[in-house]
Amino acid sequence: MKTGQTVRHSNHSDLTFLTSRAAFCGTPEYLAPELLLGNGYTKAVDWWTLGVLLYEMLTGLPPFYDENTNDMYRKILQEPLTFPSTDIVPPAARDLLTRLLDRDPERRLGANGAAEIKSHHFFANIDWRKLLQRKYEPSFRPNVVCDYPDIDPS
């Protein structure tokens, strides 16, 4: 299928296959540059968001965070990606984040599919098949206390 290709659905209606979108919505801290610029976008926005999420998990804040939303948008579009220290963000993580947070969606890690990300050296110790089959044991299981008797916390 190619962008703009029309297919006939089983109910005889025509459907146009699209690979990019133009709508603008999302959490400000996680918006990819192409969204802010009003450009069409692809799945590469999801890889940008993954980069923002991983950055926040490692450092405590999104990479371009600012209390002022307009300043945050400017930073997303223009400011260089910086890291607090190598103690917090090791070199393999820096490389992964730098490539996920590439402002050019065509050069962004993952632009050619998820296998690109899964093969990054940051994930070298992950057996993706084992993960998919849920064969990894968690390093800890939180003791979940539920205030809602109708919900099973497990």
Residue spans for each PLM region:
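Activation segment/activation loop of eukaryotic-type protein kinase catalytic domains
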Residues: 1-23
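Conserved activation segment of eukaryotic-like protein kinases, specifically the C-terminal portion
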Residues: 21-31
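Conserved end of the kinase activation segment
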Residues: 34-44
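Structural helix C-cap motif within protein kinase domains
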Residues: 59-62
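Short proline-rich PxxP-based motifs
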Residues: 77-86
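Conserved C-terminal C-lobe helix
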Residues: 88-101
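C-terminal regulatory tails of eukaryotic serine/threonine kinases
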Residues: 106, 111-154
